[in-house]
Structure formats: structure tokens, C-alpha cells
Amino acid sequence: MLLIGVAGTELSAQERDWLQHDAVAGVVLFKRNFASRTQVAELSAAIRAAAPRPVLICVDQEGGRVQRFREGFSALAPLQSFGAQYAQDPEAALAAARAHAQLMASEVRASGVDLSFAPVVDLGRGNRAIGDRAFSDEPQIVATFTRAYVQALHGAGMAATLKHFPGHGTVLEDTHVDHASDPRPLEVLQAEDLVPFVAGIEAGADAVMMAHVVYPQVAPEPAGYSQRWIEQILRGQMGFRGVVFSDDIGMAASFSAGGVAGRVHAHLDAGCDVVLVCHPELVAESLQAVQGRSLNTAALIGLIGRGALGWDGLLAGTDASFTTPLSAHFGTTA
């Protein structure tokens, strides 16, 4: 299955045709797709209307510098701010993180979008792409926040996606623009980077997004192309039964598998359920690549939200999913 990107704030005729394809599981939205709350809700409705089956609509609405929807949405803090607070007041920090998850999920749902790819559970150890997106550099602290965040997302009616497996935080390179390799053995990764993923899986996380990082002492290819990482370790040893997403095949670190078709096939052959094709110019070739493949068309049904909350209900605070008044932690919009 493919999760595709579209070019603008409205669907083109070609994009409507793409959504008819059996291999298209849904759409991932970016800043380029956002103009206002009303517009993104209308775009979400148009995506669903164009597809002959239920589809998944996703976004990266983490907070901080990775927040695609801004005007009319709450200004969400980066996750690192909660880790910093944890040293002074752990209970308050965890409560704030739960409120952050609840608010983010509720606003995203109110826009007709099913899920944000969250939380980031990488360790914050200097990676250029991760930075303040990580809760902490300490595995147990990240694990504690991961449990809380997953539970809060579920309370707000959103599936939780742990990223970027098996851990992106220790390598320096940004895989959007460069190849990355982590030389540590599996035993060290299990004692450090995998700890938050174990916690998230135990908390009931619904999905995992793979990293385009090579761990040569474990497998020779990037993790998203590796049956060893996906089938043997994530599913076999760690017992994960949810959906596995690739990271975007337009990122530089994915190019090791060759052209567009090679990247799509490498992810699916390794055990990814869904391949992210975020750049519209790569969609047609990706669709051609999956012709004739047997695809798990039911894999994403559990990730599709329980229906849009609606902004009126959100602002009135009447939805039953709220367990903490949002005003207790947040009250501003960007």
C-alpha cells in the first residue's frame, strides 16, 4: 500500500484518479496543503469523497518546528520541553505531555485528518533531523513519556505511531539529505534506543515508522529495507502486531535501493505495510511499480479515526475523549 502526497490545497484531476487506485491507502498532508482550518477540512472531505474505499489521512503535527498546520491551531511545544521540565517536576511534565497529545490529536481530528505521525521516540543525542523533537537523551525517560503520550492519543481517539525505528537519535546525519550509519551492536541498541519502542508497544501503539538508517552490525541495508529489523526483531522478538510505515522514499538515505520502483519494492519485500510517497512527482511511478503485487488492503482500517470531532465540539470542550481541560495547559493558537 502507498500513502501519497498531493501538490496543493485542492485536489487536481490527476490526484483524484490516483485515489481510485487499489494501492493507495491514503494521503499525507504537508504545509503546502494547508491554508486554513476550513480549507484543510474541505480538502480532507474531498480526499475521502474521491476514494472508493476508506482512506487514511495523515500529517506530521508534532509541535515545535514540525507542525504543518499553524494558523488557527494551537502553537504546540517541541517534545524536548517536557523532558527538560521532567528533571524539576516529573508529574507536571507528564501531565503537560498528555495534554499536548490530547490537544494535538483533537485539533487534527477536528480537521478531518485521522492521525499525526507521533510520538517521536528517538533519543535526543544530537541528530540534526531530530533535535528538539525528542523528549530526552535518556532511554527510560523517553520510555516514560512514550507510554503517557500513547495513552493520551488513544484517549483523544487517535492511533499512535512510534518513530523512527529502531532509533534515529544517535547518528548525526539527517537522512532527508544524507546517508546515515550507526555502528553500534544490537545489544547496545536494545539497551538504549529500543527501550522507548518496547514501552510504546506495551502501551498499545498502533503503528511504527521505520528509519532510513543502516545498522551494519545488525543488517547491511537501511532498517526500512531490512527483514531482519522488521520481521525478525520488531515483529518476532518485540511482538509488534500493528502497521509498519516506511519513511518517505524521496529522502536521500532511501536511494540505496535504486530508483523509485526499487525503493517501493525493497520496503514491501522487507515487511513494510505502507510506503510513504510524499512527493507527488514520484506517485505515478510508484503506482506502476505495485501493479500486480498482493497488497494488504485492510492493514490501515484500525488507524482511521472514529470520525472528525468538529471544531464546534472541540472549542466547547464537550467531547467525551477529554480527560483534562485543555485550558489547564494550553490556551493560545498560532
Curated annotation (Swiss-Prot):
Family: Belongs to the glycosyl hydrolase 3 family. NagZ subfamily.
Superkingdom: Bacteria
Catalytic activity: Hydrolysis of terminal non-reducing N-acetyl-D-hexosamine residues in N-acetyl-beta-D-hexosaminides
Stated role: Plays a role in peptidoglycan recycling by cleaving the terminal beta-1,4-linked N-acetylglucosamine (GlcNAc) from peptide-linked peptidoglycan fragments, giving rise to free GlcNAc, anhydro-N-acetylmuramic acid and anhydro-N-acetylmuramic acid-linked peptides.
Compartments it resides in: Cytoplasm
Marked site (Important for catalytic activity) residue numbers: 174
Biological or metabolic pathway of the protein: Cell wall biogenesis; peptidoglycan recycling
NCBIfam families per the UniProt record, alphabetical: PRK05337.1 (NF003740)
Protein name as annotated: Beta-hexosaminidase
Top-level EC class: hydrolase
PANTHER family: BETA-HEXOSAMINIDASE, BETA-HEXOSAMINIDASE-RELATED
Species whose genome carries this gene: Xanthomonas axonopodis pv. citri (strain 306)
Entry keyword set: Cell cycle, Cell division, Cell shape, Cell wall biogenesis/degradation, Cytoplasm, Glycosidase, Hydrolase, Peptidoglycan synthesis
